[in-house]
Curated annotation (Swiss-Prot):
It catalyses: N(tele)-phospho-L-histidyl/L-threonyl-[pyruvate, phosphate dikinase] + ADP = N(tele)-phospho-L-histidyl/O-phospho-L-threonyl-[pyruvate, phosphate dikinase] + AMP + H(+); N(tele)-phospho-L-histidyl/O-phospho-L-threonyl-[pyruvate, phosphate dikinase] + phosphate + H(+) = N(tele)-phospho-L-histidyl/L-threonyl-[pyruvate, phosphate dikinase] + diphosphate. It comes from the Bacteria. The keyword Kinase applies. Belongs to the pyruvate, phosphate/water dikinase regulatory protein family. PDRP subfamily. This is Putative pyruvate, phosphate dikinase regulatory protein. Keywords: Kinase, Nucleotide-binding, Serine/threonine-protein kinase, Transferase.
Length: 274
């Protein structure tokens, strides 16, 4: 009898791009073949406001927390919150830094992103991450025209994690929710220099993800997870994409990396056609 994989949430917080952290997290998670990690990636955590956004999501979807953060105050706040909700919180660099310090006999020179050096590619990715975080979930609509890629779709179609993945590769990415009855921002329709892509998924996948999400009092869990409602939302999203000739990617059976690979291909063709 085939056993079902156990799913869990893996939260990864970094004060830089998070590449080191993501590599370690995925390497460890891959050793547990009977488990499937749902990744939540939070790059550029450098102040309490940015941390609080991550903590809110960790509170809603508890799991394993990994981090690479230098600021002591931020680390203490993170650890205290994780202790309060009784979930593991691991600083993946701490034991390595201590080993170096002990062997070399010299103090650690703690600098954010020290491993990257000051090169143009690094600054490009940092700029893309800043832009992407600022333009998550329909925020800052007035500067959508500065995006390289804009992802649109209904709730829980992997818009945010895909945006972060693209930003880590230097692509300024915004994402805008498609909600029946809510007008699209004029700046979205006016973003002629950005590639706009619709993300969809199966009704079953979206319903499952939404059922696992702990919603606030302002939401009706029943209507949010109802398959008929989700089907209507998807129909609306498909019609919008068809009306404006936006390409659509079905993420149902795609990993974030696979979705991003298709987006890179579409972006290459889009830029060639300009």
């Amino acid at each position: 009898m085939k056993r079902e994989k156990k799913s869990f949430h893996l939260h990864m917080l970094s004060d830089a791009t998070g590449e080191t952290l993501i590599s370690v997290g995925r390497a460890v998670a891959s050793q547990y073949t009977m488990s499937q990690a749902t990744e939540h990636i939070y790059p550029m955590i450098r102040n309490k406001t940015q941390l609080q956004r991550a903590l809110d999501e960790i509170q809603q979807e508890p799991g394993i927390v990994l981090y690479t953060i230098i600021d002591k105050k931020i680390k203490i706040l993170l650890r205290k919150r994780c202790e309060k909700i009784e979930i593991p919180c691991i600083d993946i660099l701490h034991p390595v830094l201590n080993a170096f310090k002990s062997y070399l006999g010299i103090p650690t020179n703690l600098r954010v992103s020290a491993q990257h050096g000051l090169n143009a590619d690094y600054f490009r990715r940092i700029e893309a991450l800043d832009f992407t975080i600022e333009h998550d979930d329909g925020q800052s609509p007035n500067s959508l025209s500065d995006a390289d890629v804009i992802l649109v779709g209904i709730s829980r179609t992997s818009k945010t994690p895909t945006s972060i993945y693209l930003a880590n590769r230097g692509i300024k990415t915004a994402n805008v929710p498609l909600i029946p009855g809510i007008n699209l921002p004029d700046t979205l329709l006016g973003a002629k220099n950005a590639l706009i892509i619709g993300l969809i998924a199966s009704v079953e996948r979206i319903s499952h993800i939404r059922q696992n999400r702990n919603l606030g009092d302002d939401f009706s869990l029943e209507s949010y997870t109802d398959r008929i409602n989700i089907s209507e939302e998807l129909t609306y999203a498909k019609r919008i994409c068809e009306r404006f000739s936006w390409p659509v990617i079905d993420v149902t059976r795609r990993s974030i990396e696979e979705t991003a690979a298709e987006i890179f291909e579409l972006l290459s063709r889009f830029r060639e056609g300009k």
